[in-house]
Curated annotation (Swiss-Prot):
It is found in: Membrane. It holds the Pfam family TRAM_LAG1_CLN8. This is TLC domain-containing protein 4-B. The keyword Membrane applies. It is a multi-pass membrane protein. Belongs to the TLCD4 family. Keywords: Membrane, Transmembrane, Transmembrane helix. The chain crosses the membrane at residues 6-26, 50-70, 84-104, 110-130, 169-189, 210-230. GO terms for biological process: lipid homeostasis. It comes from Danio rerio (Zebrafish). InterPro entries: TLC-dom (IPR006634), TLCD (IPR050846). Residues 41-243 form the TLC domain.
């Protein structure tokens, strides 16, 4: 691994930690009235999710830029120049280390086995990208999934502030979350795996070596299984929110009808 990537990983780790400890509390208290009323355990969760949103926007938008404009990576997905991809992956690795430390320090209130599995699988695969510079296209492609994170976090923010599930903002965010999550984590699976199988049955795959082959395929399978599980949970939640909204409208309609038909 080049020293540039080491510095970026370390800087990312420290930067996100400072954002969690110093920046998020100030921003949240100034722009959100309900922030100061949250219990300590929810304050930590709030700050961590704001950091998560910032990371997702940085990495997700950088990922799209690389997909659109980095011809070297797009033309050679296995051995293309990984310069920009390694920078993006290094930012993500720093964030993942920060988040794992945060989960370990607050396991009783924030611990989640799925997130730990997700982070470890990602670090395992991204380690080869940083050290060997291989598979830049596929590493960057996986980061598209981060674009769904802001909507997931926003749902939690609404719940923490006690917004009713039938509130228009909650419903709109829930629908947007389900749609974006499906597009960037589920709908991309067929083209991604089509590209993967195109590489597997070529001499290029053999040149990678067994260790990289295993790291690449197993981590992708694990991440996609987790994404399918999360998609199922999100779809169920979105369905409940939409049906709850419809039931609320029907109830209001019945009340209005009863009032209009009332005679003294």
């Amino acid at each position: 691994m080049d020293m540039r990537e080491v510095y970026v990983v370390a800087g990312s780790f420290v930067g996100f930690q400072l954002f969690f400890s110093c920046v998020s509390p100030v921003l949240s208290s100034n722009f959100t009235q309900g922030y100061g009323k949250l219990p300590p355990n929810k304050l930590n969760d709030w700050n961590s999710r704001l950091v998560s949103t910032v990371h997702a926007l940085i990495v997700g938008l950088f990922c799209l830029y690389i997909l659109w404009y980095d011809d070297a990576v797009n033309e050679d997905p296995v051995w293309g120049d990984p310069n920009l991809v390694k920078l993006n992956v290094a930012i993500t690795c720093g964030y993942l280390f920060y988040d794992l430390l945060l989960l370990a320090c607050n396991w009783s209130t924030m611990g989640d086995v799925f997130f730990v599995c997700h982070h470890l699988a990602a670090l395992y695969a991204y380690g080869y990208v940083l050290t060997r510079g291989v598979l830049p296209y596929f590493a960057n492609f996986r980061l598209i999934s981060e674009l769904s994170t802001p909507f997931v976090n926003q749902r939690w923010f609404f719940e923490a502030l006690a917004y009713p599930r039938t509130h228009q903002l909650v419903v709109a965010n829930g629908i947007a979350m389900a749609v974006v999550f499906f597009l960037v984590r589920i709908a991309v699976m067929p083209p991604y795996w089509a590209k993967v199988f195109g590489i597997i049955y070529s001499p290029t795959f053999e040149k990678l070596g067994l260790a990289i082959q295993v790291a690449w395929i197993i981590s992708c399978v694990c991440l996609d299984i987790l994404n399918i599980i999360w998609m199922y949970k999100i779809a169920r939640g979105c369905y409940k929110v939409i049906t709850g909204k419809l039931k609320g409208r029907k109830a209001d309609s019945k009340k209005t009808t009863c009032v209009n038909n009332h005679t003294d």
